Every structure is written in C-alpha cells, then in structure tokens.
Curated annotation (Swiss-Prot):
GO terms of molecular function: rRNA binding; structural constituent of ribosome
Family matches, as Pfam families: Ribosomal_S17
Record-given protein name: Small ribosomal subunit protein uS17
Keywords carried by this UniProt record: Ribonucleoprotein, Ribosomal protein, RNA-binding, rRNA-binding
Species in which this protein is naturally found: Brevibacillus brevis (strain 47 / JCM 6285 / NBRC 100599)
Function noted in UniProt: One of the primary rRNA binding proteins, it binds specifically to the 5'-end of 16S ribosomal RNA.
Amino acid sequence: MTADRNMRRTVVGRVVSDKMDKTIVVLVETYKTHPLYGKRMKFSKKFKAHDENNTAKVGDIVEIMETRPLSKDKRFRLVRIVEEAVIV
C-alpha cells in the first residue's frame, strides 16, 4: 500500500490564500516550450489543498501531494512547508 501512496503526483507551489478552515490555495507555476517557436512560456494553476493543522500561511512555499477527493475542489493534501514566508 505505501508504494502506491508514494507514486502520487507531488508539486511545489506558493500559498496564495489561507482564509478557509483547514484549506489552502496553492499557486503552481510551470514552464512549457512553444512547439514551433521554442520560446518558454510560464503557466500557472491554483490547487486547493487540505491543511489539517492550519500551519501554512500566505507566502509560504509548500509541497502538496495528490490524494483522494476530500471535497468538491480539494484533491491535494499538504506534505510539508519547504520555506516559510518572510514577514517584513
């Protein structure tokens, strides 16, 4: 069973919202190369992720992992906080 759990997709992104209880919104940015012109273009996507202890804050860099559907929109869960946000 643990081998299947580790095969799930993990992504790293930045927390853009933590206003919901036990839920964070993570912005994940990826780069793709244009097939004809070869220019690298930036694409971004937002994922809602489950944060059981409400530990992640806005601006944190986090790692999230794919999981079973937890609600209508939540398909990811928080694995760890890679880097905490700098408060100025």
